[in-house]
Amino acid sequence: MNRRSALQACLAAGASFVASPALGKIAASDTTHELITSTITIDMHSHIPPDATVAAFPIKAGMKQAGLDAICASFPVDVVPRQAEGDWYKVYLDWVQQLKKLAKDSGIREIKSLADLESCHRDRIPGVLQATEGAHFLEGRLERLATAYDGGLRHLQLAHSVQDPISPTGDLQTLTPQFDGLTSFGRSVIAECNRLGIVTDLAHSSGKTLKDALEVSSVPIIFSHTALLSPVGLGAVPTWADNRLPMRLLRPDEAQAIAAAGGVIGVWHIFPTVSAYAAAILDLVNTVGEDHVGIGSDTGIAGAIYNANHRWPGQHNGFLHAVVGELRKQKCPPATIRKVIGQNYCRILRAVEQARDASHAART
C-alpha cells in the first residue's frame, strides 16, 4: 500500500468511524456527561513515573475522575543519565514491567489494539496504551522495536529533549540542527513502526524532521503535545524558566501539513486556565479542522505532580469534564468535541492497524 492509498483509506475509515456504534453515537442530550460517557476518550500523552504504585499513583480512580477511558502512558528514558551501552534499554524494560504491574494491581487493562480500547469504553474499565517518549532505548538496534511491540508498545515518540548520542532520529525543536532533518535511522524507525503497527509521534521533533517524516510515513502521524504558534498558543505558561516556548509550538504551515497527511495534533496542559486551554484547542481546530486535533495533556493522571484533575485554579471537576464543559461554553459543536476527545486518535490507531495488516498480507 503506497502513501496516497493509505491516506485515502484512513480518511474513508474516519468517515465511517464516527457512526460506528462501538464508538458512541450522538447522545440524545449533548451534556458534558453525555458527551464524555458516550465517546471513547483518550489522552494522547500522559506520564506514569517509573516507581508508580497503586498507593502513590491511584491511576484507576484518577482516570475515572478525569472521564478518560484510556491514556497513552509514557516515560522519557533520557531523563536518566546513560553511563554505558544498554542503560537506556534497561530503564525502558524496567518501566514497562512497572507499568504492567501497576495496571494489574490497579484493576485496569493494557490496550494493544483499537478493539481493546473499544472494550475499555464498553465495559467502563480504564486502560493504558503503552507509549514511550523518545526512541533512545533502541540505542541504534532497530530489532528492539519488534521486541518492544511484542511487549505491548503501540505508540512511539521519536525524540525528547535530550539528543540521542547513539542513534539520533533527527533534529529537535529546541536544539541547534545537526542532521538537516530526519536521519537515516529515523527513517528506518518510522518504516518499522508502519510495518509493525505502532503509532508514530513527532512531538519534540523539528519542523524539518517533521516534514521529512511526513514524506516517509505511509500512515498519518501524530504530534502529541503542543499548541499553535499564535497569540493564543503564546498565552501558555511553561513549566520551564527559559524562552523555549515559541520553539515548542507548531507554525500554522507545519500544523496544516500534519492535517493534510491525515494526522492529529494534541494540545498540552500548560495554559493558565481551563478557558485558555479550550481556546488553544479551538485555535487549532480553526486552523487545521476538527478531524486533526486531540488531547495530549502532558500531565499525570494521578499523584502529586502535574495531576490533570487538579491542573487549573478553581477546577472542581475531573480533567476532561472541565475541558469539555469549557468547550461547550465556548460554543464548540458536540460533534467536534467528540472528535477531539477521542475519535481522532482512534482513527489514527485504526489506520495504523490497517496499514500493518496490508503490509503483512503483501508479504504472504
Residue ranges, per PLM feature:
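N-terminal hydrophobic targeting/anchoring segments and the immediately downstream early-domain regions
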Residues: N2-L175, L229-T364
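Loop-centered beta-sheet repeat module
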Residues: F179-L214
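Short hydrophobic/aromatic-enriched beta-strand-loop microsegments
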Residues: P220-T226
